């Protein structure tokens, strides 16, 4: 009898633990196959997360930034010729002053895409967002964070150019390694870049891909 009671209590505790975990991380399965607009950053002041400037190498790196932070990056680097090197394979851009990306809980979006395919898909997704429309902004668990009115939509390239900076894209999977094509393109880019041009690398979190390319630059 005691053994049955112990087994029952163990099962009850196990079910309770599972319930608590599900409650703590509520995934909305109703939209698991939808393409969601998720928030990458809403910072309006200061520099982006994990910003570091290696002045002796004329390179810097960071996490994803918002439109408001572009001028801060420019002023902090303080060089006449700056090129932003975007390493994200995931489609992303700016809505109002939010940095956003397109994400699916149930699908690996843009997996295997070339840089050109990534940019083409990104342009289509951003162009589908109409000014003055109401849209939901999600987190990566599928939870709605907020609903906003769209005042402006922009690619990172356009926002960068408006601030007098140059832009270059190399699409690398989050958590992955660059393809041989991307590495070859990056080597050609470095060989042909203007002398004295400062490169600012970024991905989403400013860690894996950003650090990888900052190291590749030194090889």
Outline where the language-model segments fall.
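Cys-dependent protein tyrosine phosphatase-like superfamily
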Residues: 17-200, 212-219
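Conserved G/P- and acidic residue-centered "switch" motifs that form tight phosphate/ATP-binding loops
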Residues: 206
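Conserved SAM/SAH-binding loop-helix junction
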Residues: 209
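Bacterial N-terminal signal peptides that target proteins for export
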Residues: 1-12
């Amino acid at each position: 009898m005691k053994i049955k009671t112990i087994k029952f209590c163990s099962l009850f505790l196990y079910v309770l633990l599972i319930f608590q975990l599900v409650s703590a991380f509520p995934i909305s399965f109703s939209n698991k196959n939808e393409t969601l607009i998720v928030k990458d950053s809403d910072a309006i002041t200061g520099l982006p997360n994990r910003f570091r400037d290696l002045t002796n190498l004329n390179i810097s790196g960071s996490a994803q930034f918002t439109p408001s932070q572009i001028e801060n990056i420019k002023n902090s680097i303080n060089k006449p010729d700056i090129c932003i090197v975007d390493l994200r394979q995931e489609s992303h851009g700016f809505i109002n002053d939010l940095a956003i990306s397109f994400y699916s809980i149930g699908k690996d979006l843009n997996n295997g895409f070339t840089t050109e395919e990534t940019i083409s898909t990104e342009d289509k997704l951003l162009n589908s967002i109409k000014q003055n429309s109401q849209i939901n902004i999600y987190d990566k668990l599928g939870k709605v964070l907020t609903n906003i009115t769209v005042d402006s939509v922009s690619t990172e390239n356009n926002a960068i150019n408006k601030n007098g900076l140059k832009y270059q894209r190399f699409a690398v999977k989050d958590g992955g390694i660059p393809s041989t094509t991307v590495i070859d393109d990056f080597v050609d880019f470095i060989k042909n870049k203007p002398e004295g041009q400062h490169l600012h690398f970024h991905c989403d979190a400013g860690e894996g891909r950003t650090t990888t390319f900052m190291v590749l630059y030194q090889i």
